[in-house]
A protein has these predicted regions:
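PLP-dependent class I/II
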Residues: 2-5, 10-11, 23-26, 31, ...
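Glycine-rich loop-to-alpha-helix module at the N-terminal edge of alpha/beta enzyme cores
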Residues: 57-60, 73-81
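Intrinsically disordered, tyrosine-centered linear signaling motifs in cytosolic regions
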Residues: 60-61, 201
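Short beta-strand to alpha-helix junction loop
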Residues: 65-66
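Conserved AMP-binding/adenylate-forming core of the ANL superfamily
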Residues: 70-74, 95
């Protein structure tokens, strides 16, 4: 008789986002406003570095944490943004997903708790549970997707090990304001917990005054882990490249998890990664900015309430007025209007849908038209 597999993994469900996209892919002509992936190709100057690396046979094992020159470049790049980490405090990872996995693998013991402000990317909960820890959810909807300090304190227990924040946020596109960041800092300092910053959208910001947690609260660097990615700012989702930074005692433990999870990132992508850091993502940002404006105007015309996103490439409008669950709404939209959106329950917040505007202008406009027509029938 076969023995059971890992019971923690048995509790996990496949990605709801991927499930919706798979359903959409089965329908010819369906427009997917669901997956958070830039619709641009990787800039040629970045891709050229991989071609050159392969031509010269750069296909051997690199250092586990990434080549020193690249880690120096990442350190300088973060320094330009006001985040101070030495090259030895940086690890190149197989995307932000592996960075999160290595971080929580190194950080969590069975029974530990991680606070996850919702709505949130479902990956956080999955990684926490896979490491035999517990996800504790903090509902931010009542505070317009900001952090209420009293509500946060109510989530803290003797078992709390960390809080994970994502700003700009997936799925709302909202940015945590100074009061929210300060609330997290006060609670983290008093409780001694770690702050894991998923900063993968930090180059996709449409407003002035954006601050990152590690930038605003350098006094907590010993408790802070910063995670970044090449995927979103440089349209490199398929490359699976990211990095993380943390103080020396913390990065030393994460490095062990990283080594035994993947050994290293891909050798022949490292020069391309260094080159990417010099490429200005502003042209893509401006396209997203224009699309965001059109999306907000369209949602307003549909009488859908939405907290205006200040970053990333998502909106998270409310659909509570229709009396449908977010899952039912999205399945109905696929079947009746041939447009795919992501249910809010995938992010721990019912009564909303996530609409991504990282698609071609033509598809975006047609998708919005289909959504408008669909809503008029409800």
């Amino acid at each position: 008789m076969r023995l059971p597999m890992n019971t923690s993994l048995a509790m996990l469900k496949p990605s709801g986002i991927r499930r919706i996209n798979a359903l959409a892919a089965q329908r010819p002509g369906c427009i997917a406003l669901a997956l958070g992936e830039p619709d641009f190709p990787t800039p040629d100057v970045i891709s050229a570095e991989v071609i050159a690396a392969l031509d010269r046979g750069d296909t051997h094992y690199p250092p586990n944490n990434g080549r020193p020159a690249l880690r120096e470049a990442l350190s300088a790049y973060m320094g330009d943004a006001g985040l101070t980490f030495s090259a030895d405090e940086v690890i190149l990872t197989d995307g932000a997903t592996e960075a999160l996995s290595a971080t929580f693998m190194a950080m969590l013991n069975p029974g530990d708790e991680v606070i996850i402000p919702t709505p949130a990317f479902g990956l956080y909960e999955s990684i926490v549970v896979a490491n035999h820890a517990k996800a504790v959810f903090l509902d931010t909807e009542p505070a317009q997707f900001q952090i209420d300090e009293d509500a946060l304190r109510a989530c803290v227990t003797p078992a709390t090990k960390a809080i994970v924040i994502c700003t700009p946020n997936n799925p709302t596109g909202c940015i945590l304001n100074a009061a929210s960041l300060d609330a997290v800092a006060r609670v983290a300092e008093q409780a001694g917990i770690y702050v894991v910053c998923d900063d993968v959208y930090n180059r996709l910001v449409y407003v002035d005054g954006y601050e990152r947690f590690a930038q605003r609260h350098p006094e907590l660097r010993e408790q802070t882990v910063v995670i970044e990615s090449f995927s979103k700012p440089w349209a490199m989702t398929g490359w699976r490249l990211g990095w993380l930074a943390a103080a020396t005692p913390v990065i030393a433990e994460i490095a062990k998890a990283h080594q035994y999870l993947v050994s290293s990132a891909v050798s022949f992508e490292m020069d391309a990664a260094t080159r990417a850091l010099t490429v200005d993502p502003t042209p893509m940002l401006e396209v997203y900015r224009a699309r965001r404006k059109r999306v907000l105007a369209a949602l307003s015309a549909m009488d859908l309430d939405v907290v205006e996103p200040a970053g990333a490439f998502y909106t998270f409008p409310s659909i509570k007025q229709f009396g449908l669950t977010s899952e039912d709404f999205c399945i109905k939209a696929i079947k009746e209007a041939n447009v795919a959106l992501v249910p809010g329950n995938c992010f721990g917040t019912e009564g909303h849908i996530r609409l991504s505007y990282c698609v071609s202008d033509q598809d975006l406009d047609e998708g919005l038209n289909r959504l408008s027509t669909f809503i008029s029938t409800l």
